[in-house]
Amino acid sequence: LFLTSKLFANSEVIYGGFSYGSILPKNTLTKYVHDRSNGQSLIDKLLINNIKKLDNKSFKISFDTLSDGLSEKDQNVLVFSLDNETINFITIQGDNLTRTDIILNFQIIFFNAKNNSLTASIPLEVSKVLNSSEPLSEKQLIQELKKMYENEVMQNFFNLANNFNLKNKYNSRIGITKIILEENAENFINKNSKSNDIFKKNRFAKSLSSFLSYNNNIAVVPYGEDRTSNTIMLTFENTQREIKLPNPDYHIHLTVRGFKSVLFKEGAIDEQWIYGSYVKIQLIQPDLDKIYFEEKFKNGLNVEFSKRATKNKNSFEWIFYLDSLKILFDEFSKQTIKIDKKWLKSSSDNKKIKKSFKKISEIYEKCK
């Protein structure tokens, strides 16, 4: 019994703290929540408190610094990295309403400090919608960010880190490796985003991978098509580290096909519009030149406006297309946990699609 427990003892992981990934601190409001001018930041304190509560059977956290005598398997480091912070707002003038969306993208990174290679990465997207009568000030946004870090961010971080099965090596890995924007989708996205936004594809990859990971408890190799090299940068022990990313065995290709809205119902004072999002998702194994999954999906989101607001809806309705798309990502990723016949019937024309999700589920298991 003693030998058995030693053989399966959980790995020791060095706590690496909070880091910025592919986003510069100066381009965020998180920098005010992660202010270390007077010692530990609020994020530092929250993260340490949650790390201490972890009860994961596959690893235990050490707050010691790395030493030269550690074996390779004991040089895994955990870093919680902010990869993107997006704050958008729309104003619906007819209803005197401002909607603010805060979207935070993170990676829970486990990497080997001896060779700077990725062990596992768990993507996390946390979003919050705020309604107000006028645009929020920077001070108000910072307060809302603090609340997000104290609540939704740390709750999701804890749940993901506590339930994840960490291994020193994985037999198979999965990742989103290609984002294709068809003409309809690209025209829409370019119209509603900065023309020089080289990371626009990255945002779709982050969102889909976060839902896949959260709902299926799997690690996902970070998307790298918009990067110049197959690495990511992290800060650990006050130095920049370039972490090498493995090539996934299983590749997910996401094609965003387009967006469309239709008037569903019209009343005397209100209108209901359906905002549709359309995608194609493929799961392939390039080494075997094998396609395991290739299906088209659509999702409709019902939104009600006053007739006053619809006069100006072209200026703000893009946010509802993105809402529709994220619901599609979420529902798609849940089908490998439990089939939702109602959603599949409305989102896919393939009546035999349930068998395809069974195959995806088997592949996910190989990546755990």
Briefly describe each language-model feature range.
Residues 93-99, 268-272:
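Short, solvent-exposed beta-strand/turn "edge" segments of beta-rich domains on protein surfaces
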Residues 100-112, 273-287:
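A short beta-strand signature
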Residues 1-13:
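Bacterial Sec-dependent N-terminal signal peptides
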Residues 98-107, 194-201, 205-207, 366:
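Short, low-complexity, polybasic intrinsically disordered segments
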Residues 75-87, 97-110:
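Elongated alpha-helical scaffolds
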Residues 113-186, 206, 216, 271, ...:
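C-terminal/domain-edge helix-coil "capping" segments
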Residues 71-73, 100, 115-117:
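Edge/loop elements at the starts and ends of beta-strands within beta-rich repeat scaffolds
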Residues 10-83, 187-266, 275-278, 284-309, ...:
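N-terminal segment of the mature soluble domain
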